[in-house]
Swiss-Prot record:
Involved in oxygen transport from the lung to the various peripheral tissues. GO terms for biological process: hydrogen peroxide catabolic process. Heterotetramer of two alpha chains and two beta chains. Residues 1-141 form the Globin domain. This is Hemoglobin subunit alpha. It comes from Nasua nasua. O2 binds at H58. Belongs to the globin family. The modification N6-acetyllysine is found at K16. GO terms for molecular function: haptoglobin binding; heme binding; iron ion binding; organic acid binding; oxygen binding; oxygen carrier activity; peroxidase activity. Transmembrane segments: none annotated.
Length: 141
């Protein structure tokens, strides 16, 4: 459960990310594909080379979904219900992949905002990404 302090940290960090969210989403996906090659199997139709327009476009979708989640921290299941259905029933993404992407999102954000990435912010973002992952995999059960 996200505490009031977590919610404050998440919202303030996301405001600082601002217009870079889509860029960071693409970068995090590239990191995920490089670090966890099995994740590529869900994107056989994509050009997965660094800087790929398709990876950037999907990174933008990831960033938009996370921005929506940040705006609805008190109702993540409601905000992410459609995405949960998509990933569980249509795409059938292995739940571990959300953990991989979450890790790569943390690395990406820390590399671009080292001064703001305090232990408290790190912990809050980790809890947020974990909460999002839990919601996205909730319909697998």
């Amino acid at each position: 459960v996200l505490s009031p302090a977590d919610k404050t940290n998440i919202k303030s960090t996301w405001e600082k990310i601002g217009s870079h969210a889509s860029e960071y989403g693409g970068e995090a996906l590239e990191r995920t594909f490089a670090s966890f090659p099995t994740t590529k199997t869900y994107f056989p139709h994509f050009d997965l080379s660094p800087g790929s327009a398709q990876v950037k476009a999907h990174g933008k979708k990831v960033a938009e979904a996370l921005t929506n989640a940040v705006a609805h921290l008190d109702d993540l299941p409601g905000a992410l219900s459609t995405l949960s259905d998509l990933h569980a029933y249509k795409l059938r993404v292995d739940p571990v992949n959300f953990k991989f992407l979450s890790h790569c999102l943390l690395v990406t954000l820390a590399s671009h905002h080292p001064a703001e990435f305090t232990p408290a912010v790190h912990a809050s973002l980790d809890k947020f990404f974990s909460s999002v992952s839990t919601v996205l995999t909730s319909k697998y059960r």
